[in-house]
C-alpha cells in the first residue's frame, strides 16, 4: 500500500453528551492520510460535535481517539494543531477580514506532518 494512504486517525466508540442530550452515540470511523474526506448529515446530527472533539474543543465522554495508530488525547486545539489537524469553522466563526487561506492556517504553527 502507498504510504500516503495509511490510517491517519480513527474514532472508536466515541460518545458525547450535553446534559441529557446525546450528540454522538458510539461513533466509530477512520480517516486515511492523503485522502479528501467530508462529514455530511442532517442538521443536529452531531457533525460539528465530532469535528470539535477532533480539534480538542470538546472532550469525548467515552471512547478512544487514535492518531497514526497510537491512542491519543486531544483535549485542547494546540494538541490538534501539533498533530497537523486544522479546522475551518462555519461562517459565523471565520475572521471576515482574512482570506480563505488565512482562515485555514489561522493559529497553525509549521510542522513536519499534516493531515
Briefly describe each language-model feature range.
Residues 1-115:
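Glycine-rich phosphate-binding loops of nucleotide-dependent enzymes
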Amino acid at each position: 500500500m502507498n504510504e500516503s494512504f495509511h490510517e491517519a486517525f480513527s474514532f472508536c466508540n466515541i460518545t458525547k453528551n450535553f446534559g441529557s442530550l446525546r450528540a454522538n452515540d458510539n461513533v466509530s470511523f477512520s480517516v486515511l492520510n492523503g485522502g479528501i474526506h467530508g462529514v455530511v448529515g442532517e442538521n443536529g446530527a452531531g457533525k460539528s460535535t465530532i469535528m470539535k472533539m477532533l480539534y480538542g474543543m470538546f472532550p469525548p465522554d467515552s471512547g478512544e481517539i487514535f492518531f497514526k495508530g497510537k491512542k491519543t488525547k486531544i483535549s485542547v486545539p494546540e494538541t490538534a494543531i501539533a498533530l497537523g489537524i486544522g479546522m475551518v469553522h462555519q461562517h459565523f466563526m471565520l475572521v471576515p477580514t482574512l482570506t480563505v487561506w488565512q482562515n485555514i492556517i489561522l493559529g497553525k504553527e509549521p510542522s513536519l506532518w499534516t493531515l
